[in-house]
Amino acid sequence: MGNLKVETEMKAVILLSGGLDSSTVLYQAKADGYECHPISFDYQQRHRRELHSAFLVAQTLGVVKHQVVNFDLRLWGGSALTDETINLPQERSLDEMSQNIPVTYVPARNTIFLSFALGYAEAIAAQRVYIGVNALDYSGYPDCRPDYIQAMQKVFQLGTKQGREGNPIKIVAPLIDLKKTEIIQLGNQLGVPWELTWSCYAGSDVACGVCDSCRLRLAAFAELGLKDPLPYRERE
């Protein structure tokens, strides 16, 4: 009996883009006591530079394995992130960002991502899928809202063997009710290395400072009286 090893560690799959939110969520999952299995997506996005940050952030925690799934959403485009003929919004105010669903919305992206994460989680017998969606500072994205996450949880329950047997994989969205400033404060508590993260949509090796994602990030650091350690090509 003394030599009997009981496997008790809980596993979690974490959607990791390399950005501020998803990096915080990875660190939160680790703090919650899970064996972390990050999954990232190379969908030929304009800002593929984020994948390098995802790799670096995952390395800081010494994760078991970092999966990168490859597919090409340029096949049908529909977003400034997958179709370079669509211009990225620049220099917009926070009020302007909140008016409409922006051209940086990628059609059904989180549904695609969560489907891959669900399959991966069930294959490795993980109990949780962590995602860094945020409903308060979202740029109009419909798949970052509480009702969407609730609907996807139902899919997790009904669409898997694990769910039908009464032990559904649960979606954890710890940032969904937090403002961007609160996410940064949480990340500071968790020790997230902001200098390794990436938020810019522009697709270059230096953050532009003027796209919506950069502006949201810079505004949050500024509101807290903090300097964003990420270098920018252009600062206000």
Located regions from the model:
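ATP-dependent adenylation/nucleotidyltransferase module used to activate substrates
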Residues: L4-L190
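A polyampholytic, Gly/Pro-enriched intrinsically disordered region
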Residues: Q90, A219-E223
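Short, intrinsically disordered, charge-biased short linear motifs at domain edges
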Residues: G187-Q189, W194-G203
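Local cysteine-cluster metal-coordination motifs and their immediate loop/turn environment
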Residues: W198-A219
